[in-house]
C-alpha cells in the first residue's frame, strides 16, 4: 500500500499482522538491488558525463557521488548488521539489552535527499552542452531511485519500526 499511496498509514491491526521475516527479506534484497544495480547504473552515466566536462565540475560531481555511495553503504550495513539481527532476535523472544528500535529511529538518515542534492549539483555545475540525452537519462534514473528509496524508508518507518515497538512492549 505504501508504494501506491505514500500517505497510507497502517492501522495497529495491520502492524500486528506483519510478517517480520518477509519485510526484512524485502528490505535486505532491496539493499542489494540498490548497491549492485541502481547505484552502479547511475555511476556509469556519471562517469561518461564527468569524462566530458571540465575537471573542476567533474571532480565536484565525482566526489559528491562517492561520498553518497559510502553513506548509503554504511546506512545499509548498519541495518543489515545491527538492526535486522536485533529484530530477528526479538521475533525469537531473545531480547538484546543494549539496543532498541528508538536508537535506530534517532540515527536513521534520509538517504534519498542526497540524490536530490546530486540532481541540483548536476543542474548547477554541469555545462548545458555536455551529453544532453545522458543528462535526461541520469535525471530520470535519479528521480526513480529517489522515489523508490522514499517508499523503502516509509516501509521502515511506518511498518517495521511500529512493529518492533510493539514487540519491545
Give the label of every model feature segment.
Residues 1-169:
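Small-residue-biased structural context
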Amino acid at each position: 500500500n505504501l508504494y501506491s499511496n505514500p500517505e497510507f498509514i497502517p492501522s495497529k491491526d495491520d502492524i500486528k499482522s506483519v510478517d517480520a521475516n518477509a519485510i526484512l527479506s524485502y528490505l535486505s534484497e532491496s539493499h542489494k538491488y540498490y548497491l549492485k544495480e541502481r547505484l552502479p547504473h547511475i555511476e556509469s552515466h556519471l562517469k561518461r558525463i564527468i569524462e566530458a566536462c571540465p575537471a573542476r565540475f567533474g571532480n565536484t560531481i565525482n566526489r559528491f557521488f562517492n561520498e553518497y555511495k559510502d553513506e548509503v553503504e554504511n546506512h545499509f550495513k548498519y541495518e543489515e548488521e545491527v538492526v535486522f539481527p536485533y529484530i530477528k532476535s526479538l521475533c525469537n523472544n531473545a531480547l538484546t539489552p543494549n539496543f532498541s528500535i528508538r536508537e535506530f529511529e534517532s540515527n536513521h538518515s534520509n538517504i534519498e535527499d542526497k540524490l536530490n542534492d546530486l540532481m541540483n549539483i548536476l543542474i548547477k555545475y554541469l555545462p548545458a552542452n555536455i551529453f544532453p540525452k545522458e543528462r535526461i537519462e541520469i535525471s530520470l534514473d535519479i528521480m526513480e531511485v529517489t522515489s523508490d528509496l522514499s517508499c523503502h524508508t516509509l516501509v521502515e518507518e511506518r511498518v517495521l519500526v511500529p512493529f518492533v515497538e510493539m514487540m519491545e512492549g
